[in-house]
Amino acid sequence: MATTGEKAIYEDQNNVNIIENVVDVANGINESPKTLFEEDGSSRDSGVSMTSCSDKSDASPEEDVDFSKLESGRVALTDCSNFVSILQRNSSVSSSRSSSFYNYDTPTGRKMKTVFDLDSLDHSEYEKRVMSERPTDNHRKRTSSSMSPSVTLLDRKRSRNLSLVAPQSDKSCRYNGLNNPRDDPFGDEDDEVFEQSNVRNSQVQNTSIFAQPAPRTATSLWDLAPPMFFERKTSDTSGNGSFQERPKQILRAMSVGEIDSELPPTLEVKYTLPGVDNPQRESQAFRSISPTTLLLEFQRLGDDFDKKYIIVDCRFPFEYKGGHVKGAINLFRHDKIKPIFFPENGEASSFQNRVPIFYCEYSQKRGPTMAHAVRSIDRVLNELRYPHVEYPEMYLLDYGYKSLWSTAECRQICEPCSYIPMTHSSFSMEFKSARLERHHSMASLKPNGETSHREEKKKRCTRSVIRRNNSSLNMLSRSSSALTSTGSKTSSMENILYGLDDERRPKWVSAFDIQSTESENDLDAALIYQRNISSNASNASSIVNLAEERIVQLGLQVITPDFPDRPSESSSTTPAGEHLPLGEGGHQIPCGILDFSSISDDAE
């Protein structure tokens, strides 16, 4: 128990102060506490100074102090020193952390962390003067990195504690990557350039509650780089109020296109027949009607039905012959669309001003495809008159001929009154042939409805056959001339091959020119004609005369008849080049002998 005049020292760690209470138990005296240690607001590192605040004059003499009673006081002072050191170290770490978040000396707005506290560095006289004259409200705004809950709570506690320890620092920061212009040490302080910059920078309000870091003590290389202007904008969609940094020079490209106020007109079709509620195939090119609607239209118009409507059966020919709607035409090839619906040379089509009605067996594939093909060709041919078309109103028989045949009352408009399915076993070959023909017609169809693929292919094949026939006849003539020639010409195989390898077109004249397909009667007539000419001539020159030569058209295949035996050498009675009469020997096979001995490559 403490006696009179004894001093009990208690440690108040919450207020970071050491309080001395003088208690006089006997006399009931409790003196007001005296602070042994107080905060030094003018301290350079904003820490807690351990300066004694008990007046030296009030201190009791050394001889009046019981040192044994002050042991607890020394322990308390040691604990207080340790606590203040920890607090000062935490303050330094927190200050370095906040300075790393609030330095915008780099284009990215971040600076490398340092282990030194900038507040503990000494500054020159010029920097101190600049710091004292700089406006106190020129502070930066907070960034999104410092808005995390843990960092914010930690900084608020530190700020509350530091508000009791030291006032806010007057050091300002650089805002948005711009270097705040300092007072010109070599010129007039009233320069308009520096004044305007100071006024502009002083308008930035401080939203931070932390002690600001000290300015740099040396010139960085980033000061020499051109300034980057950043614009901070609070995100409207962000829940935590984060900021977005965007350079002012990089503007977002915005579209300046304008939508045309007047859109092109659309095709408005006034259908006269009612459609079905739930059609099997929906399309903007046609409307689906039921078999009952078609029957009622037949009964209403009677014989005038063909004058208003044209029914198009898109099935294969064997299906069409097995049963179709009265007055329907069979059209399953797409290359026949243009000649029927869009005739050329100004001829008026028999289908113009008539409404087409398409159908197939089920109206799922062939019928709708044919209707779309007609509309597509119509669009191409009337491209300059859009949206005009020649056949705006078109219909499709819903569920096709199968549905019409299934309705007993509608069978009266079928002709003949029967129905053959597409997959009927008796017409498998006709089905395969018609399907292949339909596919070829679709492949050769052009957007404008023309089909020249097959015709061009036929022309190429004809020219190829003519070239092969001419080449064969040329080779036959050269071989015969080489084998029957004497004197300077040799019959060796080398000379024959050498002549065949010559790519030049020879100047020889053949007795027959193969060009196209004809019958054998033309061959007989040509042979008789050549025999009559040769009887009036003394030599075979008339055979090779171009003016008197008769061009004979033979077939693609040359049939070599069985010639009768003839002497090895031509007799003097038989003129060279004269043909033997047909039918010699009692048979009707055309035969003849051609003597090519007088014909050479140099004949003119």
UniProtKB/Swiss-Prot annotation:
Domain annotation Rhodanese: ranges: 305-413
Molecular functions per Gene Ontology: phosphoprotein phosphatase activity; protein tyrosine phosphatase activity
Assigned keywords, A-Z: Cell cycle, Cell division, Hydrolase, Mitosis, Protein phosphatase
Enzyme nomenclature, EC number: 3.1.3.48
Gene3D superfamilies: Rhodanese-like domain
Basic and acidic residues composition-biased segments: 127-138
Biased composition (Polar residues): 44-54
Reactions mediated catalytically: O-phospho-L-tyrosyl-[protein] + H2O = L-tyrosyl-[protein] + phosphate
Pfam families membership: Rhodanese
Region annotation (Disordered) ranges: 33-67, 127-188, 443-464, 562-588
Record carries keyword Zinc-finger: no
Keyword Cell division attributed: yes
Entry's Gene Ontology cellular component terms: cytoplasm; nucleus
Protein family membership: Belongs to the MPI phosphatase family.
Alphabetical list of PANTHER family matching this protein: M-PHASE INDUCER PHOSPHATASE CDC-25.1, M-PHASE INDUCER PHOSPHATASE DUAL SPECIFICITY PHOSPHATASE CDC25
Listed name of the protein: M-phase inducer phosphatase cdc-25.1
Taxonomic lineage from the root: Eukaryota, Metazoa, Ecdysozoa, Nematoda, Chromadorea
Gene: cdc-25.1
